[in-house]
Every structure is written in C-alpha cells, then in structure tokens.
C-alpha cells in the first residue's frame, strides 16, 4: 500500500475551495445569453470550443491533488444534473460554488458544520416546493420552441426545429442529434415503426432506381423461427395470392428452398413478396416481434404458442397501409392494430421503463415505445467546420434535453428569476438553533448567484439587477440579458424547465454541503521514480 498525505481543518478546506473556484470560474463564464465560449485543447484532433458547462467541467483535471479533489466534487454536480435533467449544469455549478464559499466562511467563524448542512437542506427543500408551485405546463408548440431557443443560446432556428420534431413524433417519440455533412441543420422524421433489417435478396426490389421495396396494403407474416423449407409456407402463399395483395415475411432467417421459392415467385410476377430478418436477438427479438404484431393487428407465429405455420390463416397475418424496405432498414407505416391493444402495450413498456435499473435496457425500451407511439426524428447539425458543428451539436443536445424536461415538469420564468423568487418562501423559515438558521441564510444568498452571474456576463452590475427585480411584485418580471432590458419573462419567451432549475439546486446543495462538512483530506503521495542504471560503454554511439 502506497503512502498517503493528510491535510486537516482550515488547510484542507482552503485547498478544496481553490479547486472548486478554478473549475467554477471556468464554467460560469458560459452562463446566460451573453456567456462566452471556452476553448479546450484535445490530446488528438482539433481543439474543441463549447458553451456547455458539463463539457468544460469534464475536461478539467488539476495538478495539485488536493485542489483536484474539490474540482472533482464540483464536476459531480455538473454530471449529475446533466444525467437527470440534461441541462442546467452551469447553473448548478454557480449555485454550488456560492454555497461552498458562504459555508466555508461560516465554518471559519466556528459554526457547527452539521447544523449548517441541516439548515441548507431545509432551505433547499422549501425553495424546491416554491419552484414546483410556480411551474406551469407547456401548452403549445411555441412554448416548446421558446425553451429550445433559450437553451441553445438564443438560437431561434434550433428552437423551431426541436418544436417541429416534438410535434411530429409526440412526447414519447425518440429524437436524436447527429452531425451532418452539409452546412445546414435539417430535420429527418421517420414515420411509423422502423427496424434495422433490410431485404434478404436484391431480387425483391420493386423500385430499381432507388433500390427499394415499396408495398401498398400488404399482408405481414411474423414468424419467430427460421424458414428453410417450402412446404409449411405454401398454404399462406396460396391464400395471399388469391387476394392479389403483396406479402412481407419477417422471420429469424429465410434461407434455402423457402428463400428460393419466394424469389422465383417474385420474378415470375405471381406474387409480390419480400423477406427480412427479425430485429434484435433473444428475448429482445421476441418482444420486438410482438410489438410489430400488435401494431399491425397480426399474430406472432411461434411454437411457444402452439401455432404451426401450415395452419396459419389470413386473419393471423398483420396488415399495414404501406411498407418501405431498403438495403438496411424496414419501415412499417399505418399498421391496422386495434388502438386499445397498442395503448395496453405502450402502458406495459412504460412500466418496464420505470422498473429497469439498466441504462442500456431503458434506452432500448424507450426506442420501442417511440416506434409504437409516434416515430423517430433525427436532427442533423450542419456547419462550415468540424469545430463549429461540434459546438452547435452541444447546444442542440442541451436544447433537446431542456425541452424534454419542460414537457415533463412544466416551465418557470427564466434568467435565474425562479430561484430569486424562491427567496421569499425560504426567508419565512426560522429555527431556534442559530447554526441551522445560518445554513438557511447561506441558501438565501446562493439563490441570487445565477442571476448575478448572468448579469455580470452581460456587463451589467448584478446587485442592481437583483434589487430592481425584487422591487417589482410581478412573479414573471425579470432581466433580459440579451437586450439588457427589464421585461415580462413569460411574454418575452424567456423560460426555463422547472425540472432543470429544481435538479440544479438539489445537486448543487447536496455536494456543496458535503464539502462544507469535510474536515480532512487524504491523498496518495507521488511515487519516486527509480534512477535509471548507468549506461554501458559505447552507449553514446
């Protein structure tokens, strides 16, 4: 076991706070509409320029081990807020720094750190109640665009694209952000249910110019196992031929005699047919096939259910308005499944999302939910250079996360005003223990920190802005740092998601209170490098 170095009391806290300040000062310059960018050197490739707080925080590693402990703790604030709300990381960092600074002063004045923490916790709980009470539901596409615009650093085009994406795929739809090869930022929406399996043979293609299979009003055979022989398939093929409609076969695999027969039928023009592999593997494949069956009003042909392929009738096949298959993807549009069955399946997947502890499983379940309930949208971010595209993608990611948070828990006046207004509720708290009361006062002061920083970044005196807002009785009155004027924030479209504000305060207080109660630091001493052995004769040649 390697030797350790230990620091105590004031010396330990001073070093921790130095680390907190270094990280916080680098992050907080990005706050607000007039926040600046941070340029980050990368060990390989071009440097990265960003205005995203958590990206800056993750890049900071300090040489002094004690200071680095403080920076790492503050980085946790940004990371946790990003994980839970997806935005508000800079606000959380500014709040944490303010609580740490005031808390350290109180501890230096011989107040009890544990009582201070109790006071901080009481005040934060009261502030969160006030924020939740002020939140109002997002009611229009315009409000969704406003949230996106603010989080994307007042980029109205980004807000508009996100609002369009949400409108098209719904609240349960999946929206992803990718880098584009062009200069423009575009929105690509996939209607219906899409899975990543293409046609098994190019002979199935119906549109030879675009190499696509396109069917109108097809039947869909959903089979869980491999199809290799022709005999079990014949009754289904004969029944479908009588209707004159196309047939899509989805199975674990289609090969040998079965595939050859389907291809020959297609080429001779007797039956419009195509075959694709089932998506996923194992239990996940079973679940996805069941999703397709429910969406199309069909039945999964499975030995587990005792259904034999040779006994399948037309009523057990799924149906859809349209199907489009390319080399890599299959898209089913307008499935004819019953609404109550689809709603029941959606409710079941939602329950699984709530219960799962695995991030990977949650992501896959959300994809299935999106495919059943709305669709998938892809925002392709364009720009002139790689650096510009990456910077813009950071802002679009933030805006998208903020929009989801706003839909989940509603919106509050932005620009740090929701936190400032929460002071009124917190100031009513009283406690006979003076140290706990001091903890409440720490939070009261910290609640002003974000709005002061937004004003400072805009070149305006923060204390004047705070004073003017508190003088006005209107809960939506605030400071528009972009135009440097006082406005009704809701009318001006300057709003924040309540979830982002709440999470930022919770996470900031949680870590900051732990730093305040820290009394000793333990770090590993650097190991001395052994001297290299003397070079032998002739080593210079």
Curated annotation (Swiss-Prot):
<dbReference type="GO" id="GO:0051082">
    <property type="term" value="F:unfolded protein binding"/>
</dbReference>
<dbReference type="GO" id="GO:0005524">
    <property type="term" value="F:ATP binding"/>
</dbReference>
<keyword id="KW-0067">ATP-binding</keyword>
<keyword id="KW-0547">Nucleotide-binding</keyword>
<dbReference type="GO" id="GO:0005737">
    <property type="term" value="C:cytoplasm"/>
</dbReference>
<protein>
    <recommendedName>
        <fullName>Chaperonin GroEL 2</fullName>
        <ecNumber>5.6.1.7</ecNumber>
    </recommendedName>
</protein>
<feature type="binding site">
    <location>
        <begin position="30"/>
        <end position="33"/>
    </location>
    <ligand>
        <name>ATP</name>
    </ligand>
</feature>
<dbReference type="GO" id="GO:0042026">
    <property type="term" value="P:protein refolding"/>
</dbReference>
<keyword id="KW-0413">Isomerase</keyword>
<comment type="subunit">
    <text>Forms a cylinder of 14 subunits composed of two heptameric rings stacked back-to-back. Interacts with the co-chaperonin GroES.</text>
</comment>
<dbReference type="GO" id="GO:0016853">
    <property type="term" value="F:isomerase activity"/>
</dbReference>
<dbReference type="Pfam" id="PF00118">
    <property type="entry name" value="Cpn60_TCP1"/>
</dbReference>
<feature type="binding site">
    <location>
        <position position="51"/>
    </location>
    <ligand>
        <name>ATP</name>
    </ligand>
</feature>
<feature type="binding site">
    <location>
        <position position="415"/>
    </location>
    <ligand>
        <name>ATP</name>
    </ligand>
</feature>
<dbReference type="InterPro" id="IPR027413">
    <property type="entry name" value="GROEL-like_equatorial_sf"/>
</dbReference>
<feature type="binding site">
    <location>
        <position position="496"/>
    </location>
    <ligand>
        <name>ATP</name>
    </ligand>
</feature>
<dbReference type="InterPro" id="IPR027410">
    <property type="entry name" value="TCP-1-like_intermed_sf"/>
</dbReference>
<dbReference type="InterPro" id="IPR001844">
    <property type="entry name" value="Cpn60/GroEL"/>
</dbReference>
<comment type="similarity">
    <text>Belongs to the chaperonin (HSP60) family.</text>
</comment>
<dbReference type="GO" id="GO:0140662">
    <property type="term" value="F:ATP-dependent protein folding chaperone"/>
</dbReference>
<dbReference type="InterPro" id="IPR027409">
    <property type="entry name" value="GroEL-like_apical_dom_sf"/>
</dbReference>
<dbReference type="InterPro" id="IPR002423">
    <property type="entry name" value="Cpn60/GroEL/TCP-1"/>
</dbReference>
<keyword id="KW-0963">Cytoplasm</keyword>
<comment type="function">
    <text>Together with its co-chaperonin GroES, plays an essential role in assisting protein folding. The GroEL-GroES system forms a nano-cage that allows encapsulation of the non-native substrate proteins and provides a physical environment optimized to promote and accelerate protein folding.</text>
</comment>
<feature type="binding site">
    <location>
        <begin position="87"/>
        <end position="91"/>
    </location>
    <ligand>
        <name>ATP</name>
    </ligand>
</feature>
<keyword id="KW-0143">Chaperone</keyword>
């Amino acid at each position: 076991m390697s030797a350790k170095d230990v620091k105590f009391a004031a010396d330990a806290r001073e070093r921790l706070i130095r680390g907190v300040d270094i990280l916080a000062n680098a992050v907080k310059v990005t706050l607000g509409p007039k926040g600046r960018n941070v340029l980050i050197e990368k060990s390989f490739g071009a440097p990265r320029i960003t205005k995203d707080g958590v990206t800056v925080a993750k890049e900071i590693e300090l040489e002094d081990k004690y200071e680095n402990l403080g920076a790492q703790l503050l980085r946790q604030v940004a990371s946790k807020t990003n994980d839970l709300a997806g935005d508000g990381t800079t606000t959380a960092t500014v709040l944490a720094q303010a609580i740490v600074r005031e808390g350290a002063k109180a501890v230096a004045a011989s107040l009890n750190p544990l009582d201070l923490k109790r006071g901080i916790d009481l005040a934060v709980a009261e502030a969160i109640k006030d924020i939740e009470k002020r939140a109002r539901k997002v009611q229009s596409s315009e409000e969704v665009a406003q949230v996106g615009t603010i989080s994307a650093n007042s980029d109205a085009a980004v807000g508009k694209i996100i609002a369009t994406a949400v409108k098209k795929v719904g609240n349960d739809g999946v929206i992803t952000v990718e880098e584009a090869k062009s200069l423009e930022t575009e929105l690509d929406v996939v209607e219906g249910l899409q899975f990543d399996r293409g046609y098994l043979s190019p002979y199935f293609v119906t549109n030879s110019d675009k190499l696509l299979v396109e069917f109108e009003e097809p039947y869909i055979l959903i089979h869980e196992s491999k199809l290799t022989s022709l005999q079990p398939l014949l009754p289904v093929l004969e029944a479908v031929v009588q209707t004159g409609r196309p047939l899509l076969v989805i199975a674990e695999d289609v090969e040998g005699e079965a595939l050859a027969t389907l291809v020959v039928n297609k080429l001779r023009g007797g039956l419009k047919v195509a075959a694709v592999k089932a998506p996923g593997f194992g239990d996940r494949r079973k679940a996805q096939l069941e999703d397709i069956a429910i969406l199309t009003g069909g039945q999964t042909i499975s030995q587990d259910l005792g259904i034999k392929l040779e006994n399948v009738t037309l009523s057990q096949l799924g149906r859809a308005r349209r199907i489009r298959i390319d080399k890599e993807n299959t898209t089913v549009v307008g499935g004819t499944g019953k609404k109550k069955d689809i709603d029941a399946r959606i409710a079941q997947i939602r329950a699984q999302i709530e219960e799962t502890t695995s991030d990977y499983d949650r992501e896959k379940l959300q994809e299935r939910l999106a495919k059943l309930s709305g669709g998938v949208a892809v925002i392709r971010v364009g720009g002139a250079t790689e650096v510009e595209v990456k910077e813009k993608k950071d802002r679009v990611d933030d805006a998208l996360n903020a929009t989801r948070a706003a839909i989940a828990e509603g919106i509050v006046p932005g620009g740090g005003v929701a936190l400032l207004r929460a002071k009124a509720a917190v100031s009513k708290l009283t406690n006979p223990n003076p140290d706990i009361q001091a903890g409440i006062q720490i939070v009261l002061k910290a609640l002003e920190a974000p709005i002061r920083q937004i004003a400072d970044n805009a070149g305006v005196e923060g204390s004047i802005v705070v004073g003017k807002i508190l003088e006005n009785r209107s809960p939506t009155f605030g400071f528009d740092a972009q135009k440097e004027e006082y406005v009704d924030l809701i009318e001006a479209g300057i709003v924040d998601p309540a979830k982002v504000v709440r999470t930022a305060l919770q996470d900031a207080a949680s870590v900051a209170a732990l730093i305040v109660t820290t009394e000793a630091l333990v770090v590993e001493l650097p190991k001395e490098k052994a001297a290299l052995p003397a070079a032998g004769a002739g080593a210079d040649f």
